């Protein structure tokens, strides 16, 4: 039996396992939008924590983060440190209030929550929905690109075929049971993701001759790879780290992740959910960095004659028996699908609930919206010429800058008028885009920092003008 047949057999075996979980979850579903979009707010903290981990740690961790670390070395650790701290702060100050407010207002989407109590004006929910579909759709496309790259590296498939396979699997998950199927499969996929990453890490370090030998070889390849401080930072290390901390806090602008807080069975269980998520986050992120550094030692030619974003699957092929390569590929694809299905469900919710609120309670139209969004995402993935890291990172910053500030203020029950809300969303995204594309400063300070600051400043200015009018 050829290696490719063995790899494909194990890969398909795990896909069937995930599909079986999704199909079983469908037996627990109810045919209404509340169950399709929020699982009737009945998910226990263990499932929620595992699902949040799998959704947040997408194919980007297997592909883009490893590819980036492969290029820059140990200094990439600050991206993950800052991201974790910001994310953890958000869990303390935003997730629990979001769970409480979403139930108080009986809202099923982020857009509906943002627009709650504003009668006769749907501008906030419509603009937030458009932002979600555009940028979260692009983010979902980045996941499909990651899946396409993995299948290309292992089987030699055309990128487009791998992308289409990923899209078909995502649609099947979404149609089987909505967010309940997504969460249940996330839980199983998170175990496969963690196991595959840790297994490859251990084998790679042993092959390098141990941590000490790996570190010495990295220094010989390029001394900057073992320099913990990034070079050429225009604004210094402090602002660089702060920008990535704010990037982590930018999770509050990611509907597909924040909805995990909304599905939790009780706000009282948020602390347990947060701790499960955080422990898995730290272990998995550290393992990903270790795998990337080992890959730079074992397959150094990807910088000149390959794609650094393919470091993980390429190293798996070189180091592991065919069956284990199938497991690694399943772990990578798990990360892709667990995020993409959540993103597509959030986009379809924005389309069916916020842009066309007259269809809000139609279960069939919610499913049709899912299919429509998947086709759009597939088109973006097939026509994009960006690498996954660039596409995913800018989509995250746009969502964090556009939706983050207004969501924070909403769950803290601050009054926001339609004009101010729309200005905050558009202003934040514009500033982030200018910082990235026009000024070219994202390498020194990630654009989500100025983008989110702009959103909060716009709100602050609106309060000053309101006080002046009262005076």
Model-assigned labels for residue ranges:
Residues 1-471:
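Membrane-embedded helix-loop-helix hairpins and adjacent transmembrane boundary segments
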